[in-house]
Amino acid sequence: MYGAQVADDENDDNIFYPFASKIEWEIARWAKLRGSTSTAFTDLLSIDGVSERLGLSFKNANELNKLIDHELPTGRPKFKREQVIVAGEAFDVYYRDIIECVKSLYGDPDFAQYLTFAPERHYADDDETVRLFHDMHTGKWWWDTQKKLDAQLPGGTIVPIIISSDKTQVTMFRNKTAYPVYLTIGNIPKELRRKPSSGSHILLAYLPTSRLEHISNQASRRRAIANLYHACLRRVLAPLKSAGSEGISMCSGDGAHRRCHPLFASFVGDYPEQLLTTGVKFGECPKCDVEAKDTGSNTTPFHLRNLNEVLDALAAFDNGNLAFVRACAAAGIKPIIHPFWEDLPFANIFRAITPDVLHQLYQGLIKHLLAWLSEACGAAEIDARCRRLPPNHHIRLFTKGITCLSRVSGTEHAQICRFILGIIIDIRLPNNLHSGRLLRAVRGLLDFLYLAQYPCHSSETLHSLDEALDLFHENKDIFIQLGIRNNFNLPKLHAARHYHLMIMLFGTTDNYNTEYTERLHIDLAKDAYRTTNHKDEFVQMTRWLERKEKILRHQKYVGWCLAGGLQFEPYHSRPPDMTFRREQVMTKHPTAKAVS
């Protein structure tokens, strides 16, 4: 298909067309993927004799941009700019047609052999008593939704839509931010979705980043910001309403046409994003009805928030502002005007909120745990024990200790988790308190951390996950006796109670990790901002991204042609291995430094 779009009758033998030669294509690819600024590239080509000796058809960066814009086919939809009016103010939102984005991912030839089109049940034994959960199609959500869809329109193929959003800094100063929204589909296996280089995520939109400082009342400002967020996403996701309920014909990379139903399945974001999306108040759980004062309990019963009650409260908007505010308060949400998920078919936003290993565990509970241990055992003692750790190939050494670290990343917290239990194993606590409960609490939390990240879960490992969390709760009172905590009413601690259910619904946590979103910020927000002149930047960022995607697509086509147009062998998926082995990887040409 792409070859037919890019082909030219006069250049049938030139696989690099619209570029005249291989060297011209390589220079263009370098300039757009690896090169410096457009001004520097123009200065290079303006050197006397450079473009002539290389045989280039373009003389500067502008001519190269025109060649890419007009001659290379559009692989993914172009961005559109539209104004959204909230509280009497107009805001620009840059977005793509979500249906075309889904078709682009669904029809990508690189994913053709990997796509899954129907839910499956996997078992670890012949008696089918121990069920396995890994990719999204092995979860119960796909099964349940497929049954509901078949009851209305039999024979449809579900395309689970995974949306993630996160505001990010694009500069180290001046407080310049971008608000990207990313899209991927659950039909693509998680082993591809977690690789940024696979292109399995699409930048769907840039949302407005305005703080609405012209609104002096803080409560009104927060409400206006929430309404702006939902108004923008409602405009971006609006096509899913009819496409999800009625279905649309979509062609996969192997040429097969199916009636597909793109359905909003899950939302990936940190705690502030989850609250903004669901409309729940700060300190409460965005998924269930547990009160803020009970989030530290492991025994308080809970139920997912009742979507029908929330929708009834939102419908009270037509009854006047006072009735609307009271109805929303009774339903436990903020008064949001028409949230984006209100009319989406088969969508339940409270069920769609997924676990967040990065922010809930590493940057949440583990961060709290390290602070508690530092206060219980003494910062000087913790740092001294860190310095005395022997060198190890698989453990990072913090030679200056860990209590003085600032802006600790999730990766650094993961490294600390590898040895923190070992360095406190014989620690002495104040007031001659026995350290047994402290060690059991730390072990329970660490066990939960590692079990939550299994690439494949079974009914048995999910039971072990619950036991690890129970072990922490049974021994957490040691921190109260030490005077470190008064309570454990932490929303991130309560969120751990939902991991079991969410893994059964949507597969393991590596299906929806916010680490992928954080990594995408580099390629699709920060790098894009650096290519602009920092004035009216989003127009330039979207244009730069479109050109980059065209170059990447043409690169795949050229590589396919050079390989002789060979077809890939059939792909047979299998559950991730449940055994975890340590492997020593040696360099091909070792040096004394590499093996010491």
Residue spans for each PLM region:
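N-terminal regions that are enriched for targeting/export leaders
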Residues: 1-79
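Surface-exposed beta-strand-to-loop junctions
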Residues: 18-26, 204-219, 395-400, 444-449
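Short interface patches used for recognition in eukaryotic signaling and trafficking proteins
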Residues: 24-32, 214-224, 400-406, 505-509, ...
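Short, glycine/acidic-rich hinge or "gate" loops at secondary-structure transitions
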Residues: 57-62, 245-262, 433-441
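Terminal interaction-prone segments of large eukaryotic proteins
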Residues: 63, 69-150, 363-596
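Charged (Asp/Glu and Lys/Arg) segments that form or flank catalytic channels of large polymer-
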Residues: 94, 102, 109-111, 116-163, ...
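Acidic, metal-ligating active-site segments
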Residues: 164-211
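Short coil/turn segments at secondary-structure boundaries
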Residues: 174-178, 194-198, 218-219, 297-301, ...
